């Protein structure tokens, strides 16, 4: 399931500080439950993963579309996506699992559920070494999103640590050719970290990051 690469571009580049200003979800809002997997003889791990992948992909599209539209229903669809992705057999579709936690974390942050969002980003970061290669954009994105939620929560030391982890990863050789969108993301991370350092009274360190972002 690689559809997320195009669908999530806009959402992943949106600052969580902006998303977090949306209206809280209404108590009665709920998405219909996900379709249960068909019953029958036990499935092989591959067959189970393939069946789950189809549902996870459909929920991902709904999750991202509703989140982009700032619709509170995104919380339910993103949660269903996360819950189904967690049912993949161990060590299979790790990137799908990782992205499901990321998207649900973004949805929670969008509607001001900061602590719950942090828990999702914690789970995402824990999956990173199993799901993606060093130097990949997804590796940096996981730390970047957690850095932003730490910033919202006023935990600046932890935010600084995660920004550094995201930047350090981007300085490693990329496993695939770097696209313009990935380069924009790298620059965004550097500039956000520079802004944090400036507020923390570290202008020289902030200036170094801004210089790197300009390259």
Task: Say what each PLM segment does.
Residues 20-79:
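N-terminal leader/linker segments that initiate helical-solenoid repeat arrays
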Residues 44-50, 83-95, 127-135, 171-182:
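Flexible helix-coil transition and linker loops at the boundaries of alpha-helical arrays
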Residues 68-69, 111, 153, 200:
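Structural motif corresponding to the intra-repeat A-B loop/turn of tetratricopeptide repeats
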């Amino acid at each position: 399931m690689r559809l997320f690469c195009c669908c999530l571009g806009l959402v992943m580049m949106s600052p969580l500080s902006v998303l977090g200003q949306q209206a809280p979800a209404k108590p009665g809002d709920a998405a219909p439950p996900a379709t249960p997997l068909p019953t029958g003889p036990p499935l092989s791990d591959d067959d189970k993963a393939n069946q789950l992948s189809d549902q996870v992909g459909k929920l991902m599209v709904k999750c991202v579309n509703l989140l982009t539209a700032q619709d509170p229903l995104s919380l339910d669809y993103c949660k269903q996506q996360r819950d189904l992705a967690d049912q993949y057999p161990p060590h299979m579709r790790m990137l799908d699992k990782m992205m499901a936690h990321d998207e649900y974390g973004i949805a929670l942050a969008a509607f001001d559920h900061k602590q719950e969002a942090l828990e999702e980003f914690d789970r995402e970061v824990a999956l990173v070494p199993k799901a993606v290669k060093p130097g990949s954009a997804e590796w940096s994105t996981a730390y970047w999103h957690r850095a932003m939620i730490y910033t919202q929560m006023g935990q600046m030391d932890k935010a600084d640590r995660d920004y550094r982890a995201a930047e350090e990863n981007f300085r490693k050789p990329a496993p695939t050719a770097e696209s313009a969108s990935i380069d924009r993301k790298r620059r965004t991370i550097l500039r956000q970290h520079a802004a944090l350092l400036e507020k923390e009274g570290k202008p020289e360190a902030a200036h170094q990051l801004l210089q790197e972002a300009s390259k």
